From Swiss-Prot:
Source lineage: Bacteria, Pseudomonadati, Pseudomonadota, Gammaproteobacteria, Enterobacterales
Signal peptide as annotated in the record: none
Name of the featured protein: Large ribosomal subunit protein bL35
Any GO molecular function: structural constituent of ribosome
Family: Belongs to the bacterial ribosomal protein bL35 family.
Key words of the record: Ribonucleoprotein, Ribosomal protein
GO CC terms: cytosolic large ribosomal subunit
Keyword Ion transport (UniProt): no
GO biological process annotation, one example: translation
Protein source organism: Blochmanniella pennsylvanica (strain BPEN)
InterPro entries: Ribosomal_bL35 (IPR001706), Ribosomal_bL35-like (IPR021137), Ribosomal_bL35_CS (IPR018265), Ribosomal_bL35_sf (IPR037229)
Length: 65
């Protein structure tokens, strides 16, 4: 049986933690930042844990990670 290829776009966007959870960076921090509040931008800077509903999809994309 052939090996399953890893989706490279997903491997660049998601990292696995020591407990086996997936963390990712928030969107909306590239441009048009003047209209966003400081509090909103501060919360977007932090990494977040992937919700369980997306876990099976991401695990298909990253079979060996």
């Amino acid at each position: 049986m052939p090996k399953i290829k890893t989706l490279q776009a997903a491997s660049k966007r998601f990292k696995i933690t020591a407990l086996g959870k997936y963390k990712y960076k928030h969107a909306n921090m590239r441009h048009i930042l003047t209209k966003k509040s400081t509090k909103h931008k501060r919360h977007l800077r932090q990494k977040s844990i992937l919700p369980k509903i997306y876990l099976t999809t991401i695990m298909k994309y990253l079979p060996y990670i």
